[in-house]
Swiss-Prot record:
GO terms for cellular component: extracellular space. GO terms for biological process: animal organ development; growth hormone receptor signaling pathway; positive regulation of growth; positive regulation of receptor signaling pathway via JAK-STAT; response to nutrient levels. This is Somatotropin. SUPFAM superfamilies: 4-helical cytokines. Residues 1-17 form the signal peptide. It comes from Dicentrarchus labrax.
């Protein structure tokens, strides 16, 4: 009986200590990076929201729910079921587009210089990492098969000189959209990473 238990223990250790592939390692780095960006986006949005009056919060949230983020023009899964059905390459390509769409707008986020100086290099590092993952998963497929000619206007009117109320709305929308998009990318990369483990349950 003791020998059987010992044998099961050895087998268990053998199974759980399978070497991590290079692809899994790169995915883990990418997921960790976007997770940190998502946490930063959540913190910045919460700090800004807490600086508002209750009525200002209510009005801005109401406006935001009726508006669109710039990145909404990027074709992406509409729900968790479509996300789970999407290929790894598609999830990576959408993630790349989303990160790329924030490289310029992130410089205009109304946050402290310390936080703003963190965001740009983090986005750049993540974009580079996703590009490496796309190359590793491409197998001759087109990098951006859907809407490859799509060009996004970089939040055009957000850089104009605005009144106090419009400036408040601009800041709210930028921070809310940044948080929303980092959540999307974290979800897509997490699902894509999970696909590398056939025995894993990748449900959202």
């Amino acid at each position: 009986m003791d020998r059987a238990i010992l044998l099961l223990s050895v087998l268990s250790v053998g199974v759980s200590s399978q070497p991590i592939t290079e692809g899994q390692r790169l995915f883990s780095i990418a997921v960790e990076r976007v997770h940190n960006l998502h946490l930063l986006a959540q913190r910045l949005f919460s700090e800004f929201e807490s600086s508002l009056q209750t009525e200002e919060q209510r009005q801005l949230n109401k406006i935001f729910l009726q508006d669109f983020c710039n990145s909404d023009y990027i074709i992406s899964p509409i729900d968790k079921h479509e996300t789970q059905r999407s290929s790894v390459l598609k999830l990576l390509s959408i993630s790349y587009r989303l990160i790329e769409s924030w490289e310029f707008p992130s410089r205009s986020l109304s946050v402290g210089p310390a936080a703003r100086n963190q965001i740009s290099p983090k986005l750049s590092e993540l974009k580079t990492g996703i590009l490496v993952l796309i190359g590793a998963n491409q197998d001759g497929a087109e990098m951006f098969p859907d809407s490859s000619t799509l060009q996004l206007a970089p939040y055009g009117n957000y850089y104009q000189s605005l009144g106090a109320d419009e400036s408040l709305r601009r800041t709210y929308e930028l921070l809310a959209c940044f948080k929303k998009d980092m959540h999307k990318v974290e979800t897509y990369l997490t699902v894509a990473k999970c696909r590398l483990s056939p025995e894993a349950n990748c449900t959202l």
